[in-house]
Amino acid sequence: MPKKTSNSSKAPVLGGLRQAMKENGLDAYIIPSQDPHQSEYVADHWQARRWLTGFTGSAGTAVVTASTAHLWTDSRYFIQAEAQLAGSEFELQKLTVPYTAEHLEWLCEHLPSGATVGCDARLFTVSQARSARRKLAEKNIELSLSNYLIDDLWADRPPLPGEEVFELEQAYAGQSRTDKLTAVRSKMKGDSYYLITALDEIAWLLNIRGNDVECNPVAISYLLLGPESAQWFIDSAKVPDSLKQSLEQDGISVRPYAGIAEALRQAGSSQRIGYQPEALSVFLYELLEAGRWVKTSNLIAPLKAVRNTVEKENLKLAMHKDGVALLRLYRWLENALAQGAAPTEFEVGEKLAGFRAEQEGYFGESFPAIVGYAGNGAIVHYGAEADTAARIRPEGLLLLDSGGQYQDGTTDITRTVALGPVSEEVKD
């Protein structure tokens, strides 16, 4: 079963949030799962929704009013959310359609006309804010975006990660960053600058990798691309001197992460900046007059999606390495069960990670492994814990859903393994 979290300390936090809402004239406050880069997986520093609710799933939106607290998530997490919200004031709201803003419908139904809903402008994109404003306006409800209430309440908030980045050699990338930059600039169509906020796109474009986000080899940063040069906004302490020199030779200067705001003001004072409304935060958008922004399509994703010859061959190598690790796990598990041992789901996951780590170029899991034995294999996004994981016997089915990050590429595999005789129903 999903690990329960302690909710005993959440009442004072909710009280503090409600007091801050009252002081700022807010009738409700939205806490999403995103970070300023709209990442699927976010660093601990941006896990405000998890910190406030105790729910550890990757997708969900919390809403707090003066008298109620709610969490919306999809069917992947219903069982987990029910367990982790138990004993708290938060009530689970089950999304009927994943990735939709059903919390806005609820706000329209339960808040009076003239109410104000607050949120953190860093965590909402331009398109999300526009959509929310339109929906709330139907009931004469205002959306107020410049409310950073969590910042003052989260006393032990983890700092932004400071893991060192490294360069992905061309032997793995198959294309130099200067060639990639040239390809992107050819698509800028007269826009003086183009702002890139997605962490995976920056990593691909610059041929760099990081370790700022669990299971994702990315570095928290922004990239402002000009006609002939580029500015990479990142904690400079994370960039080795040798990499800084290499970047500078390629026309890329390293700037402080927080410097993105001033750089946009300077560039936007005389030039236009291309952006994507579904990617850019309201916080950055509102730094400039609307006329200085130019809506563009995603210039990186189409290029990133087409694998070059080197990448294709490297993906085969990554899958081969992953296959070796999986076969070694099968052999280990087979021997363990034959000798009468009963390893736990958690131990199997740790063992698989260990076999992957033996492969050249491995630097982490691509997502937390899902190892579910018997009925646990039917729990969506099941996560085995060391103290509660089921013991595996030489019977029934074992689900393995896992992957690895290699310099060659990323893997994601799902296997269902029969550990003994199975019924005709299972075979079908």
Where are these regions (language model features)?
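Active-site neighborhoods and metal-handling regions in enzymes and metal-associated proteins
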Residues: 1-428
